[in-house]
Structures are given as C-alpha cells and as structure tokens.
Amino acid sequence: MTHFTRNYSTRQMGFTIIEIMVVVIILGILAAIVVPRVMDRPDAARITKGKQDIRALESALNLYKLDNYDYPSTEQGLEALVQKPAGDPEARNWKQGGYVDRLPKDPWQRPYQYLKPGVHGEIDIFTLGADGQQGGEGVNADIGNWSLDQ
C-alpha cells in the first residue's frame, strides 16, 4: 500500500492576515454603499402596503354598494364591511360573512379613515401617514383612494 503525502509550505496553509483584512475592507465598502439604499425601503414598503389596503377596502366597498345600493355612511364606517350595520342607509342585502375578514390597520397601526360623502369623491378612504396629521410630505403624506396613482 502506497501512502501519498503532500508537502505544504507555510505559505499554502491558509489565508494570511493581510488577505483577510482586504476582504473585510471590501465588505465594509460594499456595506457603506448598500446599507443607505436599503434603509430607505421600509418607508416605501409601508406606503405600498397602505395603497394596497386602500385599494382592497375600496373594492370591498364597491361590492357592498352593489349589494345594498349605497355605500355605508360615515357613522357606519368601514366596520360595515365586517358586521352588518344598523341605521341608514339600511343594508338590506348585506352579504353573510361580510365583505372582508377583518379590517386592516394602516402601516402605522392606526385605523383607516372613511368619509361618505368624501371630500375628494363619493367616498374617501385614507390614512394620515406616519405623523398622523393631515397633509405632509414623503412618509408623512396622506394616502387616500383619490391619490393612489401618484
């Protein structure tokens, strides 16, 4: 039986400290470039989620109107999509089980706002943005069914 042995010089045994330092520096440079771009994404994701929720609520309200011939009043609110509302306008043909399973919270964990009649259309569905105040810019801007394409 023949045994083969390899002769390794100390230079071939592994990475040198300089090679490791070069790799760490390169990774640091890449992180410095990438991290600022990635850090802005949570705000964009929250805005996108808000727009998607508002579209879904608007679709559910349109189905509600098809069944009941009118949108729920401001007082009945979005809760009319989950539970049969009382009062006017009467929901004569309210769909058993509701129009949504549950009402979503806005991306900042507050309830979505609903107005009928709306300021911007027949109905308004909106969130007041990160600051919870009317108006604002960027992440603080209001997101409503009237501004989904902006």
Regions found by a protein language model. Give the residues of each.
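Acidic, glycine-rich loop-and-strand cores that form catalytic or ligand-binding grooves
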Residues: L78-Q96
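Phosphate-coordinating loops and pocket residues in cytosolic domains that bind phosphorylated ligands
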Residues: V35, D40, Q76, Q83
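Conserved catalytic core of two-component sensor histidine kinases
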Residues: V24, K51, E58
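Short, conserved catalytic or interaction motifs in soluble domains
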Residues: A32, D40, A44, L66
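Aliphatic-rich helix starts adjacent to a transmembrane/signal segment
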Residues: R37-R55
